[in-house]
Structure formats: C-alpha cells, structure tokens
Amino acid sequence: MEVDRIVSSHTYPDDKRTVMVRGLLAAMIQYHRSVLLLVQSGIVGPANSLTRNIINGLRFGLWVISCATQEHVHRIEEDEEFQLTPEMIKDMHSAYSTDPFFYKLKGRWDTQISKYTRERIIELGRWHTGLSAGLDFDEAKIRDVTTAATLCVVLLAAKFLEYQKHLTDSKQIETLAEDYPPPVS
C-alpha cells in the first residue's frame, strides 16, 4: 500500500503520543490488508468487523492527535479499556472543522461509516436463508466496505504526517483519496 510506504519513509520521535498513533496506524494498515484478503477470498462478514476496527482506530487516532492532553495519553497507556465517548468524538470533529480534506471525506462517507460502527445486531436485516444461509452482501456493499476501510487509513495517515510536519507527504496521501467515488449502498 502506497500509504504504508510513505509513512514508513520517515523516522519519528519516541514521545508517547507519536508512538501511540504510529502504532495504531500500523495496526490499521494490517487490518486493511486483511480486509482486502478476506474480500478476495469471498469472506465478507469478517471484513466488515475489521472495517469497524479500522473506523474506531481512525476516530481514536484523530482524537489523540487533535484533542488528547498529556494526561489523556498517560491514561490511555495505563488503561486497556479506555474508550472514546461521544463528547470526545464531537471534540475531534470540532478540531478538524476547518480542515477541507477531513470535511470532504466526512461529507461523502459519514453516513456509511456510521453504519459500520453499529452493533452487529443491525446486520440481522441482511441475513438470508435458503440453500446457503448467511449475510447478504452485494458488490456495491463490498466495494463500500473496502473503500471505507481504505479512506480511514488514508485520512489518519495524512493527519499523522501533517501533525509530524511532513506536509508534502501529507498532501500526497490526501491526493490518493480524490479518485474514490461516494458510497453506493
């Protein structure tokens, strides 16, 4: 993935915030690769679950970059159960309120991304029975899942590089998102 190549081309300071977000981004890139492999293998349900993890990673990473205090960073490091609250997500959205790249993606993908973060019970409406029971995924839904996962990685990578003052590479990563169409499903 081009994003991984660009992000990995730099060395970063070893402060906790940077290490946390860089590690989160590395995990998201691995999840993204897994999503693509699962979809290529026809195993779409688990790809949805991994996409949910990628979305949560995006929100968490953007919040850490834009809103977390040093005390928050320390609490996150100490508390394995640390969760973002709706207020924290709102604060993160406010922090990026003037960022055109963030709001362009948010405008096109926010509704779809919100669908992927709901509890699994919501998926019951997509179950079918017959010769082979399971969740119903058409091509448009599969494309939307993989695109959402990709754009989350792209967005966090761009904002991480911007935070690290690698502005040229941040803009280069932002351009990768330009050709992705809006969601279909």
Predicted regions and their residues:
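A cross-kingdom marker of C-terminal helix-rich interaction/assembly modules
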Residues: 1-50, 56, 60-61, 66, ...
